[in-house]
From Swiss-Prot:
One of its GO terms (molecular function) is calmodulin binding. The gene is CPK19. Residues 1-12, 24-38 have a biased composition (Polar residues). The keyword Membrane applies. A lipid is attached at G2 (N-myristoyl glycine). Induction: Down-regulated by white light in leaves. This is Calcium-dependent protein kinase 19. Ca(2+) 4 binds at D505, D507, D509, R511, E516. ATP binds at L91, G92, R93, G94, Q95, F96, G97, V98, T99, K114. It comes from the Eukaryota. It comes from Oryza sativa subsp. japonica. Ca(2+) 3 binds at D470, D472, S474, E481.
């Protein structure tokens, strides 16, 4: 087959030694990362005191704005990964760092930890790339065919990304070992690969580097689930933007990438190349050099004459042709691939996918009402860069472009993500996300219910949210301020206030200070998510 890990910009991807948990940053374009302006501390409220020997004046605390740790890449204070996980043997090594087997101390469960050396992240673009990759992994985590993200940690020397351990090895290795797959096996794998593409596109992400090396098998079993693991070249899709930087790996790169004018359709092309290899054991466009490969891709002649193609079904060849159509506007979409007769008629039905958005909505409905209100405040202040993927999801679900999502639109949107919920379960999620109770989910409510928890870890977001409730700048959220907020958001009564105070007020002074508020937002004040059976 030749070397299938060449890059369009470099023959050495720097990723192969990392056991599928790759390092892709050297070929990625610079992305714009939001900068945050930290709010100034509020002026202390004016308080007049009458001096008394018996009652000395009490000065209310002033909540200082957060002070970020200098030179942090993740934008939050240093966090020692070794306080949660013990790092074990090396699994692989790449240009930017090392992947280790790690064990969660509390549970004994094993994961993979990619430790990226900060010394090697020399440029601003390198740091932005790491941030974006983590953001996309967090955004997509929770899907059946996407590796589960467990957490990101940063210390003085490294950024550590902990994720699901896939013990079955690379799909690429199995392809080489077998030479080719049966049509049934190829259809199963193709469905999983295209399902990843479909979910990425629905959630506003373009992968840009689909290839067998970037898929790992969850276990060593023959029918192990396939997991996409490497999102180092992925970007959030910007509506109307055509991308021009050449990225990807030589055999799998789409012709429009070489012409420097492309969109998300490139992922379907790459999946089509994978399907061709699954069926025949060789790539459709082959040459001794990268230039030769690129010339063959631009020429676009697909060989269906050599063995084993005469024995391959016409339906399979039809799907390959449609996925490898030169004109991206005429190329089949990922959703259409999944409906193609070769996949649809030859496959048993999939198990329901508990999608990322669904998982977060389940957690959201279990939160206390102060946390829901605070999330809404944070959501309304997030910038475009932070919510690109969720914005695309909202647009996809809001089919009538009304600016709100109805029950029917929510049900249809979740179905597109692969979830098979009953009407009662969808209604429960609808009621949870519909904070103001008007029967539909507006844009801010949707972002509030579905944004990933990592957004809450930024101190500046928590500080702004605390200031929103602390109207008199006293350094505390009082019962009166809580009551005012609940009335404004139409979210509760006196009993609700009592419940919130008792849950969050850990020092039992009848008020909520900034530390208690942060503890609640970072997890201390959230109940266990309810299970939908």
């Amino acid at each position: 087959m030749g070397s299938c890990c060449s890059r369009a910009t470099s023959p050495d991807s720097g990723r192969g030694g990392a056991n599928g948990y790759g390092y892709s940053h050297q070929t990625k374009p610079a992305q714009t990362t939001p900068s945050y302006n930290h709010p100034q501390p509020p002026p202390p409220a004016e308080v007049r005191y009458t001096p008394s020997a018996m009652n000395p004046p009490v000065v209310p605390p002033v909540v200082a704005p957060p002070k970020p740790t200098p030179d942090t890449i993740l934008g939050k204070p240093y966090d020692d990964v070794r306080s949660v996980y013990s790092l074990g043997k090396e699994l692989g090594r790449g240009q930017f760092g090392v992947t280790y087997l790690c064990t969660e101390i509390a549970s004994g469960k094993q994961y993979a930890c990619k430790s990226i050396s900060k010394r090697k992240l020399v440029s601003k673009a390198d740091k932005e790339d790491i941030r974006r990759e983590i953001q996309i992994m967090q955004h997509l985590s929770g899907q059946q065919n996407i590796v589960e993200f467990r957490g990101a940690y940063e210390d003085k020397s490294n950024v550590h990304v902990v994720m699901e351990l896939c013990a079955g090895g690379e799909l690429f290795d199995r392809i080489i070992a077998k030479g080719h797959y049966s049509e049934r096996a190829a259809a199963t794998i193709c469905r999983a690969v295209v399902n990843v593409v479909n979910i990425c596109h629905f959630m506003g992400v373009m992968h840009r580097d689909l290839k067998p090396e970037n898929f790992l098998l969850a276990t060593k079993e023959e029918n192990a689930m396939l997991k996409a693991t490497d999102f180092g070249l992925s970007v959030f899709i910007e509506e109307g933007k055509m991308y021009r930087d050449i990225v990807g790996s030589a055999y799998y790169v789409a012709p429009e990438v070489l012409r420097r004018n492309y969109g998300k359709e490139i992922d379907v092309w790459s999946a089509g190349v994978i399907l061709y290899i699954l069926l025949s054991g060789v790539p459709p466009f082959w040459a001794e050099t990268e230039k030769g490969i690129f010339d063959a891709i631009l020429q676009g002649e697909i060989d269906f004459e050599s063995q084993p193609w005469p024995s391959i079904s016409e339906s399979a060849k039809d799907l390959v042709r449609k996925m490898l159509t030169q004109d991206p506007k005429k190329r089949i979409t990922s959703a259409q691939v999944l409906q193609h007769p070769w996949l649809r008629d030859g496959e048993a039905s999939d198990k329901p996918i508990d999608s990322a958005v669904l998982s977060r909505m389940k957690q959201f409905r279990a939160m206390n009402k102060l946390k829901k209100m605070a999330l809404k405040v944070i959501a309304s202040n997030l910038n475009e860069e932070e919510i690109k993927g969720l914005k695309q999801m909202f647009t996809n679900m809001d089919t009538d472009n009304s600016g709100t999502i109805t029950y029917e639109e929510l049900k249809a949107g979740l179905a597109k993500l692969g979830s098979k919920l009953s009407e009662a379960e969808v209604k429960q999620l609808m009621e949870a996300a519909d904070v103001d109770g008007n029967g539909s989910i507006d844009y801010v409510e949707f972002i509030t219910a579905t944004m990933h928890r990592h957004k809450l870890e930024r101190d500046e977001h928590l500080f702004k949210a605390f200031q929103y409730f602390d109207k008199d700048n006293s350094g505390f959220i009082t019962r009166d301020e809580l009551e005012s907020a609940l009335i404004e958001h139409e979210m509760g009564d006196t009993s609700t206030i009592k419940d919130i105070i008792s849950e969050v007020d850990t020092d039992n002074d009848g008020r909520i200070n900034y530390e208690e508020f942060c503890a609640m937002m970072r997890g201390g004040g959230m109940q266990q998510p309810m299970r939908l059976k």
